């Protein structure tokens, strides 16, 4: 009797490419032909275009898979959110994840005990990254790729911005093709990076400001993983540079655009409100040397509704943002530690998740939208204490 593993090899890519991406790793041990196919860069690249987008929420050092549904915009809307599972790093149940950096379905995770691991949540594969010098919780990281949507891990790189032993800023690159770090001579950000970065195409982006602390010295900072250089890009023309911002956050819209959220306080007839503005880049990233922006959303909220946005995901068509926020516990005011998810947009203003904790958490909640990827991660590097 003929079984599926006996099918001609040239038929397998078409058949298996129709399966959900997350189910494929469970099948790779079926036979040698299948295992070889799942490591084939052409097959991996084909699956990248078919996998459904997923959302995860970093909260209390755990990565949770969530589903957010929004219907009936702008009138008669209904919103709901479900936790669909917890993603666990293999052999890492005791790990406390401090930050997540995402690129093409791969996660770079910094832990509370200053370790660094690259993780493919789709395949479950990981590799620990040995430091050149001891990691610090203040280090800035980004995961990127010199080739857009590359199907080979060897094309990926890690950027680390840190201080050397003399407290001077240093930028260094971990190159997966050589499994080693190297210092970028004369290349530093030379600014304050004020939010978690995002990866798009071959670059990483942050909201940043000059160390001179002047209103004009605020910009989008880009690091190009192909050229390994920083560049400063413009903010929206009507960005409130002179405001005392509660938060400014960068996000990605699909696979082609950046979004920027600014949250600040203002008063109307003596009452304090929190205003949110969201912009989206007009053109696809990479089509111009600088950025041009369009303001697509302005919302005014009661001040206690959204204390401090830590991340957001934008539905540009519906003009709705899914935001995470945090309230740190305060013994003086008896405020409790809270982690929340909030929907804001045209005709929408609602919490879908609100967790209260008596214990203070030291990591900000963070939302990530990603497409599962079959990029193969080689065996773990040994863990070395530095």
Curated annotation (Swiss-Prot):
Disulfide bond entries: none
CDD domains noted in UniProt: F-box_AtFBW1-like
InterPro entries: F-box-assoc_dom_typ1, F-box-assoc_interact_dom, F-box-like_dom_sf, F-box_dom, SCF_F-box_component
Keywords: Kelch repeat, Repeat
Pfam families: F-box, FBA_1
F-box domain span: 1-48
Chain positions of Kelch repeats: 155-203, 340-386
NCBIfam families listed in its UniProt record: F_box_assoc_1 (TIGR01640)
Name under which the protein is recorded: Putative F-box/kelch-repeat protein At3g17280
Taxonomic source organism: Arabidopsis thaliana (Mouse-ear cress)
């Amino acid at each position: 009797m003929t079984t599926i593993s006996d099918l001609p090899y040239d038929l397998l890519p078409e058949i298996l490419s129709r399966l959900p991406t997350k189910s494929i790793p469970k099948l790779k041990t079926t036979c040698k032909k299948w295992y070889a196919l799942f490591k084939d860069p052409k097959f991996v690249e084909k699956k990248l275009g078919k996998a459904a987008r997923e959302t995860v929420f970093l909260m209390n050092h755990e990565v949770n898979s969530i589903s957010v549904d929004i219907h009936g915009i702008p009138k008669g809307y209904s919103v709901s959110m479900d936790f669909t599972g917890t993603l666990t790093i293999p052999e890492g149940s005791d790990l406390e994840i401090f930050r997540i950096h995402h690129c093409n379905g791969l996660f770079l995770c910094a832990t509370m005990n200053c370790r660094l691991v690259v993780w493919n949540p789709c395949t479950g594969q990981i590799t620990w990254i040995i430091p050149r010098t001891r990691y610090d919780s203040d280090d800035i990281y980004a995961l990127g790729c010199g080739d857009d949507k590359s199907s080979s891990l060897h094309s990926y790189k890690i950027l680390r911005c840190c201080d050397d032993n003399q407290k001077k800023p240093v930028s260094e690159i971990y190159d997966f093709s050589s499994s080693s770090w190297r210092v970028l001579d004369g290349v530093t950000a030379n600014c304050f990076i004020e939010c978690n970065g995002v990866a798009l195409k071959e670059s990483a982006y942050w909201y940043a400001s000059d160390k001179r602390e002047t209103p004009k010295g605020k910009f989008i900072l880009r690091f190009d993983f192909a050229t390994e250089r920083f560049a400063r890009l413009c903010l929206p023309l009507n960005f409130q540079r002179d405001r005392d911002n509660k938060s400014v956050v960068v996000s990605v819209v699909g696979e082609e655009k950046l979004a920027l959220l600014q949250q600040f306080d203002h008063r109307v007839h003596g009452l304090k409100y929190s205003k949110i503005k969201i912009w989206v880049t007009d053109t696809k990233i990479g089509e111009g040397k600088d950025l041009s922006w369009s303001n697509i959303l302005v919302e005014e909220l009661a001040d206690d509704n959204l204390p401090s946005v830590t991340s957001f995901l934008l539905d540009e068509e519906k003009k709705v943002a899914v935001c995470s926020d945090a309230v740190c516990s305060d013994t003086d005011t008896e405020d409790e530690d809270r982690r929340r998810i909030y929907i804001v947009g045209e005709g929408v203003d609602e919490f879908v998740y609100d967790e209260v904790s008596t214990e203070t958490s030291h990591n900000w909640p963070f939302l990530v939208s990603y497409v599962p990827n079959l990029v193969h991660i080689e065996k773990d590097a040994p863990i070395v204490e530095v």
